[in-house]
């Protein structure tokens, strides 16, 4: 029953389609035969157009199918062409042996030629990737350095504190003509090449406390601040008149070492000298004052510390007459 109902519905659809495509005269004839308003369904001529298995071939004539489906020029022409062959993408040649799982692709490290300097420190990276470079300052604190890293030419301030640097070589600061401050506090420095600082004419502050130095190298004359506290400096490790030519030196900190005498003569520019906690037992008469210039006063030198030494300062009264204040230390 369902099949018969479906075939009947299909026949009606095809009949309607066929009627629309019939010639004008045939359509007019059929319209005249259709019942008008008010007609009774009882007089409706059934003819043989009703689809049934016996007249299926007569109702639908497929012999003129091309004529029935010809729309003339009403539809745009569609050009049918063959598809272009698909572009074949050859897989990249692999150097991995068959059956071997491929490893993750390796990333190419970007070039570092645009950094301040392309030199490589002992970490295998440019200095300004290991350290922090801000303008003319380089901060290399507490990164386990064992040597002075290559520095940008424009470096003026170097901070490499709390590392494991054991030696300063002559070439470590070569060509760094703008270097003003070097701070190597809390390292393991036991030796400095004699020419390591000599050509650094712009150097003002040299800060080397808490190392293992036993001697000082030749120092540039422009230094203003020298801090070598908490080392192993001996008097024999400081060259005679080492500070005389340093006409800009204002602060000299040599406390907590192994000095047995005051290194002198000291420059007139000096404002503060700390020598506490050494092994000093005596001093020269001219270490602070010129014994022949009794009218001269060293007004700038107001801070002298000799406490923590075995010396009895009361035994050398003529050594302080030019000072605005007496040194701090033992007078009994």
UniProtKB/Swiss-Prot annotation:
Tissue-specific expression: Expressed in cartilage and synovial membranes (at protein level). Expressed in the retina, iris, ligament, skin and fetal liver (at protein level). Expressed in the retinal pigment epithelium (at protein level). Expressed in synovial fibroblasts and subchondral bone osteoblasts.
Protein name, as recorded: Opticin
Glycosylation sites: 312
GO molecular function, one term: extracellular matrix structural constituent
Compartments where located: Secreted, Extracellular space, Extracellular matrix
UniProt signal peptide: 1-19
Annotated S-S bridges: 289-322
Record's keyword terms, sorted: Disulfide bond, Extracellular matrix, Glycoprotein, Leucine-rich repeat, Repeat, Secreted, Signal, Sulfation
Highest taxon of the lineage: Eukaryota
Residue positions where Sulfotyrosine is found in the record: 65, 71, 139
Repeat positions for LRR: 154-175, 178-199, 202-223, 248-269, 270-290, 300-320
GO BP, sorted A to Z: angiogenesis; articular cartilage development; bone development; collagen fibril organization; negative regulation of angiogenesis
Start and end residues of each LRRNT domain: 116-153
Keyword NAD carried by entry: no
PANTHER family per UniProt: EPIPHYCAN-RELATED, OPTICIN
GO cellular component, one term: extracellular matrix
Biased composition (Basic and acidic residues): 29-39
Keyword field contains Repeat: yes
Annotated family: Belongs to the small leucine-rich proteoglycan (SLRP) family. SLRP class III subfamily.
Its job: Inhibits angiogenesis in the vitreous humor of the eye, and therefore represses neovascularization. Binds collagen fibrils. May be involved in collagen fiber organization via regulation of other members of the small leucine-rich repeat proteoglycan superfamily.
UniProt xrefs under InterPro entries: Leu-rich_rpt (IPR001611), Leu-rich_rpt_typical-subtyp (IPR003591), LRR_dom_sf (IPR032675), Mimecan/Epiphycan/Opticin (IPR043547)
Main location: secreted
PTM (free text): O-glycosylated.
Quaternary structure note: Homodimer.
Pfam families: LRR_8 (PF13855)
Residues the UniProt record annotates as site (Cleavage): 20-21, 32-33, 87-88, 114-115
